[in-house]
C-alpha cells in the first residue's frame, strides 16, 4: 500500500433520530464531531415496514411535491 494516501480515521459521535448516541470510527468530519442522522434504521420505512412520513429537512420534499404532486401516478 502507498503511504499517506488514506483519509484520517478518527472517533465521532452519531446521534440517531430517537436520540440514541454512540461512538464509532469514521473518515467523516474531524475528531469528536457529531453526526445527527435525519433518517436511520429505526425510522426508515424500508426497515420498519411502515408507511411513515419522511422528515422534510431543507424543504426538499416540499419542493418535489409542489413540482410533481399533480402527476397523479
Curated annotation (Swiss-Prot):
Gene Ontology molecular function terms on file: rRNA binding; structural constituent of ribosome
InterPro entries according to UniProt: Ribosomal_bL28/bL31-like_sf, Ribosomal_bL31, Ribosomal_bL31_A, Ribosomal_bL31_sf
Keywords: Ribonucleoprotein, Ribosomal protein, RNA-binding, rRNA-binding
SS bond partners: none
Keyword Protease attached: no
Transmembrane intervals: none
Quaternary state and interactors: Part of the 50S ribosomal subunit.
Protein family per UniProt: Belongs to the bacterial ribosomal protein bL31 family. Type A subfamily.
Protein name: Large ribosomal subunit protein bL31
Native organism: Allorhizobium ampelinum (strain ATCC BAA-846 / DSM 112012 / S4)
